[in-house]
Amino acid sequence: MSFVLPPRVPNGRTIADFCCKEGGASFGYYLAGFDVVGFDREPQPRYPFPFVQTDLREIDPEWLRQNFDGAAGSPPCWAHSDLAHRTGREYEDFIPETRELFEASGLPYVMENVEGAPLRTPLTLCGTMFEGLRVSRHRLFESNVLLTAPRPCPKRHPLHFTHDKRKAHYGQLDEWSAFVTVTGGGNSSKAAAEDAMGIPAGWMTKDGLNQAIPPAYTEWIGRQLAEHIVAERTVTGVPA
């Protein structure tokens, strides 16, 4: 990792981020003011926050409740990805176990996944909703907190830069100003994808970038989550 975390205004809350990978979602919660602790069953040497290598199925929900103000997670999306649908290959699905842990903890939670994943009444976020992003990258967010989007997703999205000569707009767009595709055929360079997603340059590997979401998504959601925590504690009389 070769970047310095930018300054932000701490909100005094701590959030646990499960299946954190290299930290795209965690970075957004950090920008929203949370202190973040990441959990993943694989080593994550590029993760920029305190990190615990463990399987979420080993976590005690009571321990989680006592040590954190909120919980977040991005269980592996392979089981619900376009690739799985095209190939018919089966992948392990951690969504039920993630939900079970979060609900048992009683904490406000957010769970993120790809379109098509079986999330409950999810909010959909898209890069077009955020100033400065140049990706579509639709993602679903399930929560026990009422979440809203910054604006509606347009019916038609901007054309994306492509290396695919079969596309009618091939050669007409610049990857540093147009929308880009981070994964899949005809995708952009890693550097342009980082810029388009609001990811600091030089932080993530290409695989990490492929699995990440724009931090702007979880910064937006994190601010709503923090407001909910304060409001809930005000109602219950617990010091905010």
Pin down the residues of each PLM region.
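Class I S-adenosyl-L-methionine
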Residues: 18, 40, 53-55, 59-70, ...
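S-adenosyl-L-methionine
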Residues: 1-34, 38-39, 45, 240
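Short, well-ordered coil/turn elements that cap or connect secondary structure elements
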Residues: 10, 31-33, 46-48, 65, ...
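N-terminal beta-loop-helix "entrance" segment that forms/cooperates
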Residues: 43-53
